[in-house]
């Protein structure tokens, strides 16, 4: 059944078409795109682990906070712009939606240049602060230098791709991501194994592949046949629109900033109790967990235009129906991830490296870290639901609660309780997941009663 591959001629079907059909049409392309992207990251780590060595995996893991910051700024602009444009389309205000597109374009360029330049200048100092040692610093430095030189390309691709998905073209957004991942995998294998460029080759492949994806996205928005596209007379920044984009996009921004901060604390904790290899083990677990989490993110990206449009049109029954269906699917997906990780941890982590010490640390950590995966699925959907309806403050509070209110204190206390050491770091993750889930459920029940 291929109806989800057919481009929507108008986003206004979001208030009339069956919800199940809409979720398939919007979510499946996003899920495929996010899953394939995550699979690329996994395969890239496998290439690095087998083609370079276990310390290279640790070096790559040290770059996660910086990569989270890149994603933080990209998603603040892209997701914020996508949500605002969906709401304007729900109100039948196509001109405002077009203004949002142009503002996203300019913001991505400015933010990409500023972030890339500043980070590149202080790169070594930043990486040492993140926990790099003499053994891992060269790998982390070589990777990030290339990524930062192509930073504007990353910002534009991620930001505009989000808007394309939200304005009625989920299948094109999926194809742009698939194109990027396909090119990335081919180039990474060539650069690492044939040319011998090491971790620098993996980063070069990433930027070149995103350049291909960006050309695809720009071709769409320069076409007058696209429902929302670049037009003369709109190439200027509107303060109100910029403020709205930053406000709604603040939730994913803070999620990623907090994730970066947490990863810094986690990396330092693992370095204290297990050395450089423990950081690499966390990097492997992070890649595996992210694979399933990206499926849920893709699901919520498909939910976002449906919920945002119908909320703007005041069709609250359709909003609730969509939310309940998405939560059910998310819990089911994360349950599958939990079962696979609990039953086959050694086989899963063994794909990344032949190093027995690294695999032992990663397999034991994986079984603990994903213990409450099903609850994470529901919590992520609820948080993104509030973002989709423009309730940025609620979404931000729920995001911060998980990262700062629950996880951070646990990271500082559990390792010292009963000599838990490295296991205290691992156990802080599922415990914070339970607390974050309870907070999200209570908040959702309160809000649904409010709009009944």
Language model: regions and residue ranges:
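Transmembrane helical elements of multi-pass membrane transporters/channels
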Residues: 25-44, 146, 180, 209-213, ...
């Amino acid at each position: 059944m291929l109806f989800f591959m057919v481009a929507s001629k108008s986003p206004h079907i979001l208030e009339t078409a069956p919800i199940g059909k809409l979720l398939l049409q919007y979510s499946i392309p996003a899920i495929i795109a996010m899953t394939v992207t995550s699979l690329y990251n996994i395969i890239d780590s496998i290439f690095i682990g087998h083609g370079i060595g276990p310390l290279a995996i640790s070096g790559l893991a040290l770059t996660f906070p910086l990569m989270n910051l890149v994603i933080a700024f990209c998603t603040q602009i892209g997701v914020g712009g996508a949500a605002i444009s969906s709401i304007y389309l729900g109100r039948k205000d196509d001109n405002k939606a077009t203004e949002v597109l142009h503002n996203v374009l300019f913001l991505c360029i400015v933010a990409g240049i500023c972030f890339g330049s500043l980070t590149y200048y202080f790169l070594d100092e930043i990486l040492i602060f993140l926990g790099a040692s003499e053994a891992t610093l060269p790998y982390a430095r070589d990777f990030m230098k290339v990524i930062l030189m192509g930073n504007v390309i990353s910002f534009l691709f991620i930001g505009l791709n989000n808007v394309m998905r939200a304005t009625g073209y989920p299948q094109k957004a999926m194809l742009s991501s698939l194109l990027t991942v396909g090119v990335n995998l081919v180039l990474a294998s060539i650069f690492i194994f044939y040319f011998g460029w090491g971790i620098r080759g993996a980063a070069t492949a990433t930027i070149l592949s995103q350049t291909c994806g960006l050309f695809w996205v720009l071709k769409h928005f320069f076409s007058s046949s696209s429902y929302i596209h670049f037009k003369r007379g709109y190439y200027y920044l509107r303060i109100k629109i910029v403020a709205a984009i930053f406000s709604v996009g603040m939730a994913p921004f803070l999620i990623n900033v907090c994730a970066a901060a947490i990863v810094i604390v986690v990396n330092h904790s693992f370095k204290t109790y297990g050395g450089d290899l423990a950081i690499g083990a966390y990097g492997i677990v992070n890649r595996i967990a992210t694979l399933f989490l990206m499926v849920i993110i893709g699901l919520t990206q498909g939910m976002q235009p449906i919920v945002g449009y119908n909320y703007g049109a005041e069709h609250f029954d359709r909003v609730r129906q969509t939310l309940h269906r998405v939560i059910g699917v998310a819990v089911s997906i994360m349950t599958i991830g939990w079962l696979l990780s609990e039953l086959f941890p050694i086989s899963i982590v063994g794909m990344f490296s032949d190093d027995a010490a690294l695999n032992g640390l990663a397999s034991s950590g994986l079984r603990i870290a994903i213990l409450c995966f099903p609850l994470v699925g529901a919590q992520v959907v609820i948080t993104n639901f509030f973002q989709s309806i423009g309730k940025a403050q609620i979404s931000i509070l729920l995001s911060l609660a998980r990262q700062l209110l629950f996880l951070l204190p646990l990271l500082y206390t559990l390792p010292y309780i009963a000599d838990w050491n490295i296991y205290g770091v691992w156990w802080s993750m599922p415990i914070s997941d339970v607390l974050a889930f309870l907070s999200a459920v209570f908040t959702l029940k309160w809000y649904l009663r409010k709009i009944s």
